[in-house]
C-alpha cells in the first residue's frame, strides 16, 4: 500500500483533516500537520475506524459475483440441452436460433456495459472543504456535479466564468448553499511563520502551572541590580563597571516551593526591543523607586513601557532604611501616573523594602507569587518547545550562543531548532547557575550552542522533530529577512499617515512629546488630544521634559509612533537610532504649527517641503539690446552649470537686485538646455532688462526634502 498524506486521506473520505489527526493522536501517532504522510499500517487502522463496513461489503460483493457465475453456468447447460434436442431441425431454424442467441448475447453485453455507468453516478456530499481561490472545475469535482451546472448558476447570478475561473469565498458559499451543501474553508498553514506554533495556553486542557517571568525596571541608581542581587544571593553589582548592568541575563529562584524567573535587563530592552519584534515574555513588572529620590524621568518611561505592554506592575519602594526616605511622597507622585496603592483604595501593590539589608524581600516575593496565581500562568511541558531569545553572542570558543526563555513545551539537548532566522541542533545547554542540563521546561532560562548564526534578542524559537525541516525553514526565513531589509520600513510617518488611514492600517496615531518645560508639554498634549479626524485617534503614549533620547526612539519604533520635539533637539544617539529604525521625528517651536501639521497629515493635505540648491553662476561680460526681445546678457559660466528651467537671481555688488526665471538660454544661435562651466552663452530673463556688465547671474532649483 503506497503512502498517502493526511489531507488526501481525509479528502477521499469527505472528512476533516482535524478528525483524522485527532484519531491518529488517539493511536499515539505523533502528528506535525495535515501534510504528514501516513504509513500503510496507520491507514489500515484508520480504515477500521472510518470504514467499519468495508470488510463486510467485500464479502457481499464476492457472494454476488459467485451467484452471477452460477447463473451463467445454468444458462449454458440449458442452451446445450436445447441444441441437442433440436439437432434434426433445418439449417434455417438453426440459423435463426443462432441469430436470436447472438441478439440475446448482444443485449446482455449491452446491459453489462451500461451497469457501471449507473454505479458511477455519485451522490452530492453533505459537506465539503475548499481552499482559497478554488476554480469552477475543482468545486464541481468536490460537489460531484458537472462544471457546466456551476457555470450556468454563475451566469444566472450575473457572473461570466469558465471552468478555470477562480472563485471568491462569497461565490463559493452561494453555490454551495444553492445545492444545500455545507462548506468549510481549509486554512493553509505557513510552516515558515513561527507564530503559528505559539498556541494559546488557556485553550490547552493539559496545561499546568508555570513559574512567573519577572522584569525589574526603574531609574538609574535606584537599586535594580542590588535588588536582584539580594534576591538570588550573588554579587553581580560589584563586578560591573559603574554599577550599571552590562548584559541581558535571566535567573531562576525558588521561594516556598514556587519558582520565579527574573530577567536582568539593561534599560527597558525587555519591553522595547523584544516587543518591537512581536515578542511578549514578561508576566510581571517590578518598578523600583528610591524612597529618598521619588519619581524620576526613567521611572515614568518604565511605567509607560509596562502599560503599553499591558503587564501588571508591582512597585518596590527601595531604600526605606535611609533617614531621608519618604515612601508616602513616592505613593503620591505615582498616583499622577495611574498607580494607586491598595491602602488608598487602588489596585497597585506597593512593597517597602531595603535591597541592601534584605528587609522586605520576602514580602516582595510573596506578592509576586500572589499576582502570578491570580494570572493563572500555565504551559504544557509535553508539547514542542517554543520561546524567545533573551540575548545572543558570538563566543570565540563555542561559536554562536543564545540565551533562551522556554515559554511552552520542553527543550532537550539534540532537538532540531529554528531560532529567528537561524537554525541548528541543540549541542549543549547550560542553566543560569552555569551547570549543564539535558532539558528545560516552561519559564526556564538556558543558554544553548549549536545554531549556525547569532540571532537577535526578541526572536522566537521553535523545535522540530526533523533536522532537514528545521534547516529548510531557517534558510527560507533568512532569505525572507534579507528581502524585508531591502524594502522600505513601514513605520508610520506624517507623510504616509493618510495612505495608511485609507488602507485601514491606522486606528491610533501614537505620539511621544518631548519639550523644554512641563507647561509647554502639557499644553501641546492637550491641544493634540482635541484633534478630531474621522478614522484615526490621537494617542499620547509618553511625555517628558528634556532632549529626545534613544529610549524615546526605541519606544516610538516599538509602538509604531512619531516623536514631536518642542523647543528641544535629539541627541546624537537618538538621531542615529531614528535613521536606522525610520522613526519620524518632528521638531517645532510653535504649538500652532505642530497642530496644523498633524491635522493636515491626518486629512492627507501635508505639503512637501523644499530647499533651494544653487547649481551654477555666470558672469555678465557684455549686454545687447534687441527690439521686441529686450536685453541679452552675454555671459561666461564661472561655476557649476546654467539650465533653462532654473530659477535665477541677479546679484550686483553682492546685493540681489532681481529674482525670477530664465526666458532663453542660447549658445551661438541655438537654444540649449544647459551650459556647463567654462563656456559662454546668451541669457534673457523674464520681465527684467536692467542687466549690466559684471552682474552675477546665479541659477538655482528647488529640491524636495526627503522626510
Curated annotation (Swiss-Prot):
Q: Name one GO cellular component term.
A: cytosol
Residues binding GTP, per UniProt: 218-225, 264-268, 318-321
State its role. One of the essential components for the initiation of protein synthesis. Protects formylmethionyl-tRNA from spontaneous hydrolysis and promotes its binding to the 30S ribosomal subunits. Also involved in the hydrolysis of GTP during the formation of the 70S ribosomal complex.
Q: Basic residues composition bias: which ranges?
A: 89-98
Residue span of region G1: 218-225
Q: A single Gene Ontology molecular function, please?
A: GTPase activity
Q: Where in the cell is it found?
A: Cytoplasm
Question: Top-down, what is the taxonomic lineage of the species of origin?
Answer: Bacteria, Bacillati, Bacillota, Bacilli, Bacillales
Major place of residence: cytoplasm
Q: Which domain of life is it from?
A: Bacteria
User: What are the residue boundaries of the tr-type G domain, all occurrences included?
Assistant: 209-378
Q: Which organism is it from?
A: Staphylococcus carnosus (strain TM300)
Which portions of the sequence form the region G4? 318-321
Q: What is this protein called?
A: Translation initiation factor IF-2
Biased amino acid composition, Low complexity: 99-114
Amino acid at each position: 500500500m503506497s503512502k498517502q498524506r493526511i489531507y488526501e486521506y481525509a479528502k477521499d473520505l469527505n472528512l476533516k483533516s482535524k478528525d483524522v489527526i485527532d484519531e491518529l493522536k488517539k493511536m499515539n501517532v505523533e502528528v506535525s500537520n495535515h501534510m504528514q504522510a501516513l504509513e500503510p499500517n496507520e491507514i489500515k487502522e484508520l480504515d477500521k475506524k472510518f470504514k467499519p463496513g468495508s470488510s463486510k461489503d467485500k464479502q457481499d460483493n464476492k457472494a454476488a459475483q459467485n451467484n452471477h457465475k452460477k447463473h451463467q453456468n445454468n444458462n449454458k447447460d440449458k442452451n446445450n440441452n436445447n441444441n441437442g434436442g433440436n439437432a434434426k431441425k433445418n439449417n434455417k431454424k438453426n440459423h435463426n436460433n443462432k441469430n436470436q442467441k447472438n441478439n440475446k448475447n448482444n443485449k446482455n453485453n449491452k446491459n453489462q456495459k451500461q451497469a457501471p455507468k449507473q454505479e458511477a453516478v455519485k451522490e452530492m456530499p453533505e459537506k465539503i472543504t475548499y481552499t482559497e481561490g478554488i476554480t469552477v472545475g475543482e468545486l464541481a469535482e468536490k460537489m460531484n456535479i458537472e462544471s457546466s451546472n456551476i457555470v450556468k448558476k454563475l451566469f444566472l447570478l450575473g457572473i461570466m466564468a469558465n471552468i478555470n475561473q477562480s472563485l471568491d469565498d462569497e461565490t463559493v458559499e452561494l453555490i454551495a448553499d444553492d445545492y444545500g451543501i455545507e462548506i468549510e474553508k481549509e486554512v493553509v498553514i505557513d510552516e515558515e511563520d513561527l507564530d503559528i506554533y505559539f498556541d494559546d495556553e488557556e485553550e490547552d486542557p493539559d496545561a499546568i502551572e508555570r513559574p512567573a517571568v519577572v522584569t525589574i525596571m526603574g531609574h538609574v541608581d535606584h537599586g535594580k541590580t542590588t535588588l536582584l542581587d539580594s534576591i538570588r544571593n550573588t554579587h553581580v553589582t560589584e563586578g560591573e563597571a559603574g554599577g550599571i548592568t552590562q548584559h541581558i541575563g535571566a535567573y531562576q529562584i525558588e521561594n516556598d516551593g514556587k519558582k520565579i524567573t527574573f530577567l536582568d535587563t539593561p534599560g527597558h530592552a525587555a519591553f522595547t526591543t523584544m516587543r518591537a519584534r512581536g515578542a511578549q515574555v514578561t508576566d510581571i513588572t517590578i518598578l523600583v523607586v528610591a524612597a529618598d529620590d521619588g519619581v524620576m524621568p526613567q521611572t515614568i518611561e518604565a511605567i509607560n513601557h509596562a502599560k503599553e505592554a499591558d503587564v501588571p506592575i508591582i512597585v518596590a519602594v527601595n531604600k526605606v532604611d535611609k533617614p531621608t526616605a519618604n515612601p508616602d511622597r513616592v505613593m503620591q507622585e505615582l498616583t499622577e501616573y495611574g498607580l494607586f496603592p491598595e491602602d488608598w483604595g487602588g489596585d497597585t501593590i506597593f512593597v517597602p523594602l531595603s535591597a541592601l539589608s534584605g528587609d522586605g524581600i520576602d514580602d516582595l516575593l510573596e506578592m509576586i507569587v500572589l499576582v502570578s496565581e491570580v494570572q493563572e500562568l500555565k504551559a504544557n511541558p509535553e508539547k514542542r518547545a517554543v520561546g524567545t531569545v533573551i540575548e545572543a553572542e558570538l563566543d570565540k570558543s563555542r561559536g554562536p550562543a543564545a540565551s533562551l526563555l522556554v515559554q511552552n513545551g520542553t527543550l532537550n539537548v539534540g532537538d532540531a531548532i529554528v531560532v529567528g532566522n537561524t537554525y541548528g541542533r541543540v549541542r549543549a545547554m547550560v542553566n543560569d547557575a552555569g551547570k549543564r542540563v539535558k532539558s528545560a521546561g516552561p519559564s526556564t532560562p538556558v543558554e544553548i550552542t549549536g545554531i549556525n548564526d547569532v540571532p537577535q534578542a526578541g526572536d522566537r524559537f521553535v523545535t522540530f522533530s526533523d533536522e532537514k525541516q528545521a534547516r529548510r525553514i531557517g534558510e527560507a526565513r533568512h532569505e525572507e529577512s534579507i528581502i524585508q531589509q531591502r524594502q522600505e520600513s513601514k513605520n508610520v510617518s506624517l507623510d504616509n499617515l493618510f495612505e495608511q488611514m485609507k488602507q485601514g492600517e491606522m486606528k491610533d496615531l501614537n505620539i511621544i512629546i518631548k519639550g523644554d518645560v512641563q507647561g509647554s508639554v502639557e499644553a501641546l498634549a492637550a491641544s493634540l488630544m482635541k484633534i478630531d479626524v474621522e478614522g484615526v485617534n490621537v494617542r499620547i503614549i509618553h511625555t517628558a521634559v528634556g532632549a529626545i533620547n534613544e529610549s524615546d526612539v526605541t519606544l516610538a519604533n516599538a509602538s509604531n509612533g512619531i516623536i514631536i520635539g518642542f523647543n528641544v533637539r535629539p541627541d546624537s544617539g537618538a538621531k542615529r537610532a531614528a535613521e536606522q529604525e525610520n522613526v519620524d521625528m518632528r521638531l517645532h517651536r510653535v504649538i500652532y504649527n505642530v497642530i496644523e501639521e498633524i491635522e493636515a497629515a491626518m486629512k492627507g493635505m501635508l505639503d512637501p517641503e523644499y530647499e533651494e540648491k544653487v547649481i551654477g553662476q555666470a558672469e555678465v561680460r557684455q549686454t545687447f539690446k534687441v527690439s521686441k526681445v529686450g536685453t541679452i546678457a552675454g555671459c561666461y559660466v564661472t561655476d557649476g552649470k546654467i539650465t533653462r528651467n532654473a530659477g535665477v537671481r541677479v546679484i550686483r555688488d553682492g546685493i540681489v537686485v532681481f529674482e525670477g526665471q530664465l526666458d532663453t538660454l542660447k549658445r551661438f544661435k541655438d537654444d540649449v538646455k544647459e551650459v556647463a562651466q567654462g563656456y559662454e552663452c546668451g541669457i534673457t530673463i523674464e520681465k527684467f532688462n536692467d542687466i549690466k556688465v559684471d552682474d552675477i547671474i546665479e541659477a538655482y532649483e528647488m529640491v524636495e526634502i526627503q522626510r
